[in-house]
Amino acid sequence: MNDSVMRHTDSTHPIVVTFNVGSATIKMAAYDTAQAVDSSPLAWSPLFDVNINLKTKNKVWHAMPQSLADWEPQDTLTDTAVSLFTRVRQAFPAREIVCIHRVVHGGKRYHVPVVINETVMAHLVELSPICPLHQPPALSVVNALQGMDKKLVHIAAFDTAFHYHRPEIWSSYALPKSLRDQGVRCYGFHGLSYQAIMRKLETYLPKIAKKRLIIAHLGSGCSITAVENGKSKDSTFGFSGLDGVPMGTRPGHLDSGVILYMVEQGWTLEQMNQCL
C-alpha cells in the first residue's frame, strides 16, 4: 500500500489541525499523528496562500486531493478557517480530527493546554478585553467549528503559559491587592513562539539552550524575553499586548501619566483604544 493511500485509510491515528488566528491573518497546518512528532505537516497555508502542499517527511505528496488543490481564501478569518477545515476533512474522511488553537491569553487559570468546554470558553471570553485584537478572532473560529460538528475536540494552547511560572517579583505590579486579585499582573505573550525557539535550541544547540538568553519575537507584534535554563525570567510585555517595544500599530511602553493626560484632554475610551 503506497503512502498516499495509507493517509486516507489509516483510522487509528487522528489528523491534528492547528489554527493560529491573529488580528488579520490565519495560519493552518494539518499533521498526521501516525508519523514522527517532528515530521512535516500534511498541509499548511497562511491566509491568501492557496498553494497548499501535502507532504510526507521530506517530499511533496504529489497525489494532492482536489479538495485541497482548488481551495481559495474566504472573506473573513472565521470563514477561511471553516473552509480550510472542511477541505481537510474532505481529504481525510475516515480519520478522526482534533483541532488545536493558539489562544493568546489563558489568564492566571490556564498554563497548560486544555480541552475547550463551556467553562473554559466562558473564562477565555472574559479575558477578551485584555487582548481585543487576538482573543475574539481565535474564539470565533472555535465557535464556528463547534457549530459544524459538536463532536470535534478542540484544545487551546496559550501564549501566556511560557511566562506563567515567573517569580512573583517579576509578575506583580505595585498596585492595590484588590486589583491584583482581579488578575492585573504582568503576563507576557508570544510564549508559543518562544517555546518553539527553545525546542530548536535544545535540539541543535543544547549547551546554548541552558545559558541566559535574550530572545526577540519580531513581527507586526514584537516582544523581547529573557530566558534562563529554558524558563522565562522577564519579558517586555506586561498586562496586555500594548507594553514593551514599539510595534506595527502599537506604541509600546508608555509612562502611565500619558494615559492620564489623554483622559484629561477628553479622549474617549474608544479613541484611546484606536490610538494605542
What are the functions of these language-model segments?
Residues 165-264:
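Glycine-rich phosphate-binding loop of actin/hexokinase-like ATP-binding domains
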Residues 36-94, 115, 120-134:
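N-terminal phosphate-binding loop and adjacent alpha-helix
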Residues 101, 132-197:
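Gly/Ser/Thr-rich active-site cleft segment
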Residues 212-216, 270-276:
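Beta-strand segments within the central parallel beta-sheet cores of soluble alpha/beta enzyme folds
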Residues 31-38, 112-122, 169-178, 229-234:
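A glycine- and small-aliphatic-rich helix-loop capping segment at beta-alpha/alpha-beta transitions
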Residues 23, 75-79, 115, 119, ...:
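Conserved active-site and cofactor/substrate-binding residues in soluble primary-metabolism enzymes
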Residues 10-59, 211-233:
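Gly/Thr-rich phosphate-binding beta-strand-loop-beta motif of the actin/hexokinase/Hsp70
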Residues 88-135, 153-155, 161-173:
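Short beta-strand-loop/turn "lid" adjacent to the catalytic site in phosphate-handling enzymes
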